[in-house]
């Protein structure tokens, strides 16, 4: 008989082991056996909880996107009366949260983006994440700008966030957060009306 609460513990172990494996050897070379060994479980446990490697990648990305959502929402909830500029900076901060810019998370995101072009479930998950970012940005810009301008500014800031993140991920170096925040702050102030 399985122990109560073990499923969530096992899932967490396996997701963490997947992130470690992706970080060290990449998604393509990370095998179910390696991930199971890192998690200290049998390969059958992975099949039981996730079906296969793709199911494990999907669960890992759901976990990372959930952390992203929480990082953004926690910052926004701290600013209920915040200005559009403050709330836009909060969204930027959530996207550059440590849960999103650690080496393991960055490599997992890259593997996820590549896999999403070929796997419908991962594609849907990627689209939800992308739309959520754009919707949040446009909504905040729209507090100060007409709809069309808000959409353009939101799209531009989303591209800047993704571009800064991607450049850091591909460089193999940590994201330069002060520079990223400076560039995004400049973009935001250039697009919001001045008082």
UniProtKB/Swiss-Prot annotation:
Which GO terms of the molecular function aspect are on file?
DNA-binding transcription factor activity; transcription cis-regulatory region binding
| SUPFAM superfamilies with a match to the protein in the record | Homeodomain-like, Tetracyclin repressor-like, C-terminal domain
Q: What does this protein do?
A: Repressor involved in the biosynthesis of the osmoprotectant glycine betaine. It represses transcription of the choline transporter BetT and the genes of BetAB involved in the synthesis of glycine betaine.
Which superkingdom is the protein from? Bacteria
Residue ranges the UniProt entry marks as DNA-binding: 31-50
Query: One Pfam family from the UniProt entry?
Result: TetR_N
Give the species this sequence originates from. Answer: Escherichia coli (strain SMS-3-5 / SECEC)
InterPro entries, per the entry:
BetI_C, DNA-bd_HTH_TetR-type_CS, Homeodomain-like_sf, HTH-type_TetR-like_transc_reg, HTH_TetR, Tet_transcr_reg_TetR-rel_C_sf, Tscrpt_rep_BetI
The biological pathway it contributes to is: Amine and polyamine biosynthesis; betaine biosynthesis via choline pathway [regulation]
Annotated coiled-coil positions are none
What is the name attached to this protein's record? HTH-type transcriptional regulator BetI
Record keywords, A-Z: DNA-binding, Repressor, Transcription, Transcription regulation
GO BP of this protein: glycine betaine biosynthetic process from choline; negative regulation of DNA-templated transcription
UniProt domain HTH tetR-type: residue ranges: 8-68
């Amino acid at each position: 008989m399985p122990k109560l609460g073990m499923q969530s513990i096992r899932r967490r172990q396996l997701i963490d082991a997947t992130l470690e494996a992706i970080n060290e050897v990449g998604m393509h070379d990370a095998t179910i056996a390696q991930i199971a060994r890192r998690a200290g479980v049998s390969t059958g446990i992975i099949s039981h909880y996730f079906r296969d490697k793709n199911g494990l990648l999907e669960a890992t990305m759901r976990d990372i996107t959930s952390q992203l959502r929480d990082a953004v929402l926690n910052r926004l909830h701290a600013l209920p009366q915040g200005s559009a500029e403050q709330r836009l900076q909060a969204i930027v901060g959530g996207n550059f949260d440590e849960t999103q810019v650690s080496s393991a998370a960055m490599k997992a995101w890259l593997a996820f983006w590549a896999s999403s072009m070929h796997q419908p479930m991962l594609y849907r998950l990627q689209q939800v994440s992308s739309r959520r970012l754009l919707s949040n940005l446009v909504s905040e810009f729209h507090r100060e700008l007409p709809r069309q301008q808000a959409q353009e500014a939101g799209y531009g800031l989303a591209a800047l966030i993704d571009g800064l993140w991607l450049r850091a991920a591909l460089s193999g170096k940590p994201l330069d957060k002060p520079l990223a925040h400076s560039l995004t702050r400049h973009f935001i102030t250039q697009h919001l009306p001045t008082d």
